[in-house]
């Protein structure tokens, strides 16, 4: 199980934080009690992350 802690300061921070958590729950299928249904793994589970483009295309910074 993964854990995530977020700290929001002030009224605007709390409102933005609530909106973000609502979006995260909708996108990832998280229920109101914080649990993810076992049969609704979205995006391949914990092992899959999008880290941008793969490979070296000769980009230099």
From Swiss-Prot:
Principal place of residence: cytoplasm
Protein's name in the database: Tubulin alpha-4 chain
Keywords of the record: Acetylation, Cytoplasm, Cytoskeleton, GTP-binding, Hydrolase, Microtubule, Nucleotide-binding
PTM comment: Undergoes a tyrosination/detyrosination cycle, the cyclic removal and re-addition of a C-terminal tyrosine residue by the enzymes tubulin tyrosine carboxypeptidase (TTCP) and tubulin tyrosine ligase (TTL), respectively. Acetylation of alpha chains at Lys-40 stabilizes microtubules and affects affinity and processivity of microtubule motors. This modification has a role in multiple cellular functions, ranging from cell motility, cell cycle progression or cell differentiation to intracellular trafficking and signaling.
PANTHER family: OS01G0282866 PROTEIN, TUBULIN_FTSZ GTPASE DOMAIN-CONTAINING PROTEIN
Top EC class, one word: hydrolase
N6-acetyllysine PTM positions: 40
């Amino acid at each position: 199980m993964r854990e995530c802690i977020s700290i929001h300061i002030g009224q605007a921070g709390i409102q933005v934080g609530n909106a973000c958590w609502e979006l995260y729950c909708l996108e990832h299928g998280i229920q109101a009690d914080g649990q993810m249904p076992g049969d609704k793994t979205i995006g391949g589970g914990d092992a899959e992350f999008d880290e941008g483009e793969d490979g070296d295309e000769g980009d230099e910074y």
